[in-house]
Amino acid sequence: MSQTNDKPALHLVPSFYGVYILKSIPKPRRTYIGSTPDPKRRLRQHNGDLKVGGAYRTKKDGSRPWTMVVLVHGFPSRIAALQFEHSLQHAYQTRHINNDARITSSSRQSSMHSKLANIRLLTTSFDKMSLKIAIFDEEVYRMWVENKHKIECNVPCTLFKFDEFCNSIQEIDIEDAKNILLGKQLDCMVCKASIDYFKDSTPNISSREELSNYLAKGNYPLIGICGDHAFHLSCIARQRGPAMVPKSVTCTTCGQKLDWSDIIKVSTRLRHYVVQDSLHLAITQL
């Protein structure tokens, strides 16, 4: 393993990551599929408004300007988004679409109806993630509602104005959670065990493997905050029933319904903050 890859690292669930479809304005039948944590900036790159970035395919043949028409978002990692992106680009062969359900049989450019149908098919394979779909074009939204290929999809889909949607994307704020954690001794409201995030002594850790082994022993477990209460994610996740990952959980103290994707975003950042400070590490974000 290289020295760079062996540095201590923790996974942070991104504030935002999405897979998008662009449509060329001068050549409406031409489309492009990509992924990004910043849709507004990425569109500017594709259109040449920013000198750095973009993609060769969106620069050539008089296809500019482009407009973003569809954005699937809510991915828990860049890797998950890239998997969805690759599957949407290669819907004719991806393992994430069952052969008997496949509607795209070749790598040739497919219609917007087909792309929307493939999104519907892919969400079944990615159903453990709290995905949502934003559409920024009224005609494309009409196609989604029409559902030409009659494929069921339980992922919420909403028509937005592009700029308004992008302006609504916010970084995850953990200040309130930090204040609760620092303010008093917390017990898990499910198992009642003390949440020990502040230790009298900590080991010297210099590698990713050492940090992984230390956390695997139960040190700095992922925790969630609701009001001034806390819980181990492993405890409250038992509400999930047969699902591997819950879509939401209910606070056992106040009864509030909590979105799992929001909980995990705060939880991974809170642990990153405490571990980095307590172990005196410069931790890489995965």
From Swiss-Prot:
Compartment(s) where it occurs, according to its Swiss-Prot or TrEMBL record: Nucleus
Top-level EC class as recorded in UniProt: hydrolase
InterPro entries cross-referenced by the UniProt entry: GIY-YIG_endonuc, GIY-YIG_endonuc_sf, Slx1, SLX1_endonuclease, Znf_RING/FYVE/PHD
Superkingdom, natural source: Eukaryota
GO cellular component annotations of the record: Slx1-Slx4 complex
Single annotated GO MF: 5'-flap endonuclease activity
Keywords: DNA damage, DNA recombination, DNA repair, Endonuclease, Hydrolase, Nuclease, Nucleus
GO biological process, one term: double-strand break repair via homologous recombination
EC number of this enzyme: 3.1.-.-
Domain GIY-YIG, residue spans: 15-98
Chief location bin: nucleus
Cofactor: a divalent metal cation
Pfam families: GIY-YIG
Keyword Transit peptide: no
Assembly information from the UniProt record: Forms a heterodimer with SLX4.
Family stated for the protein in its record: Belongs to the SLX1 family.
PANTHER family, A to Z: STRUCTURE-SPECIFIC ENDONUCLEASE SUBUNIT SLX1
Function per UniProt: Catalytic subunit of the SLX1-SLX4 structure-specific endonuclease that resolves DNA secondary structures generated during DNA repair and recombination. Has endonuclease activity towards branched DNA substrates, introducing single-strand cuts in duplex DNA close to junctions with ss-DNA.
Protein known as: Structure-specific endonuclease subunit SLX1
